[in-house]
Amino acid sequence: MTSWNTLLSPIMRIEPLRRQSLVTLFTTLALTAVGFLSTMYFAHAVGESVLGAYFLFLAYFNTLNLIFDGGLGGAIVKRISEGREIDEHFTAAFVMRILLVGISIILIIFARPILENIDRSGVSSWLFIALIIGIFWSSVSNGNYGSGKVGLNQTCGFINSASCVVFQVIAVYLGYGVNGLAGGFIFGMIAATIIGFRFLDLRIKRFNAGHLKSIFSYSFWIFLASSGSLVFSYADTIIIGYFLKTADVGIYRVLFQFTTAATFTTTAMSTVLFPKVSSWNANGELEMAENAFSKGVTYSLLLAVPVFVGGVLLGDKMLYFFYGESFAQGAKTFYVLLVVQLVNVFMFLQTMYLNALNRPKESFKVTAVAAAANIVLDFMLIPVIGIIGAAIATLITMTMNSFLAYLALRRIISLKLEFQGIRNILIASIIMGLGVRCYRVLVPLSNIWLTLIPIMFGAILYIFLLLKLDTNIRDELIQIGKQIGFQ
């Protein structure tokens, strides 16, 4: 115990918001790395068709899970973060989740003909099991997250993903294919639920109709807004699976996952900020939320911009060597998706802010318009030009969503950007891009090792330039170092 205290005490000396941001950042980075490496292995071990079947399983799971959740997850995080009658609200949401299990059983039985493509993949039974386990995992995760245990929640998320990947790698190696992938997904949720429950402070307590009304008044709009977000995440996957081959699903989802490297800082910032912004709003401290927004955008672009530049310059070779020749054929789609992730920085933060500021209705309105347009464009473009049509549809409608969210959010708080910080990020990224471009002109990228060199060189050059140009980021690192104990 003493050794653990010695190890953790420097970290605990860091100011809480910084500490939670760092824990979230590093766990998200670790999750991203684990996800990328495992997907690379699966791409070579089982190919794009098996991966496509697994991605369809995930698409249906997340779609059905949203329906069965009904917005309860977001609502309970919101109500618990406000700090009023938290046990009663948690219990009310948990009981509703249990009741929805019965509804899920009935819906899946009647929906078997609709789920024909996933039935052919042999993972329909895994889907049913995953939905049941997901209810308990979501309850524990949302309970800890709403209680402000952001670092713990991220750690459990890491355990979920890491356990999932370890199980999947072993199962794929033993030849279980898509069943091993689906089984690993469920195993990860079980492991994270057990550990997260150990630290859950919330308890089952009698609730009344008032608590249900409080949850549903918020969950209804969260459900509708989440439905819109889900369209951006999985509608294209399901539509590609309907019009094209399962292999095309595998290629598209791998490309999409690869580009999400640009937004892991956005995910980290949003995860940390949501309960904070919710609390600031409840206490009338909107100025704190305004300052955090400008910082959130800057720190989100910190990675998104250089990843975009590097992806455009090296994307075709990275896809070829990391995943295989069939995935490299989607390079043009990959470039479009890189732009999508830049837009996603603003859309993600702005819609998160609308929900945290107790404006789920506004969040739904802006997302619903874009989501409807996304489905229409998917049906128009995917049958004609393939997976690049899905990427173009996502780019157009996500830009629309971001703009509409901006118009709604600026009526609530004052939106400011740190133009100096953004300028420094752009300058460092451009110079990095020139350096990487010169390397590619001079050195043929004939193998994976020659491809990794410009990636590492570009990263080092970018970090050096950014720390040289931006005193705020440099001072932030120095401050964290002092709080840890480095002088």
Where are these regions (language model features)?
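Alpha-helical transmembrane segments of multi-pass membrane proteins
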Residues: 63, 67, 98, 102-106, ...
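Hydrophobic alpha-helical transmembrane segments
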Residues: 124, 156-202, 218, 256-259, ...
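Membrane-water interface segments that mark the loop-to-transmembrane alpha-helix transition
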Residues: 20, 24-31, 57-116, 121-125, ...
